[in-house]
């Protein structure tokens, strides 16, 4: 059975490589034509692009005080309870640890 599978895989990969090769040919022709129009050489011409000026960003001076959930008492309780629940294993899961 191994030989049959190997032949089937080889046949499929061969046809895929052929299709990719056929698809790459027109791309090379178009790229060559564009290079010929640009100056007759196969090398790409370097064009310098002017640098854009940096944008000025306004930074707010007033600090915004938002209460994080971890800083409040209810947030701490929620985090503590969530940590305990993640350690337990449900009875229906069947994924107990055997040491």
Curated annotation (Swiss-Prot):
One of its GO terms (biological process) is viral tail assembly. One of its GO terms (cellular component) is virus tail. It is found in: Virion. It comes from the Viruses. Pfam families: VirionAssem_T7. InterPro entries: Phage_T7-like_viron_assmbl. Residues 59-99 are annotated as: Disordered. Keywords: Viral release from host cell, Viral tail assembly, Viral tail protein, Virion. Its main location: virion. Plays an essential role most probably in virion tail assembly. May form a scaffold around which gp11 and gp12 polymerize. Gets ejected from the infecting particle into the bacterial cell. Belongs to the T7likevirus protein 7.3 family. This is Protein 7.3. It comes from Escherichia phage T7 (Bacteriophage T7). The lineage of its organism: Viruses, Duplodnaviria, Heunggongvirae, Uroviricota, Caudoviricetes.
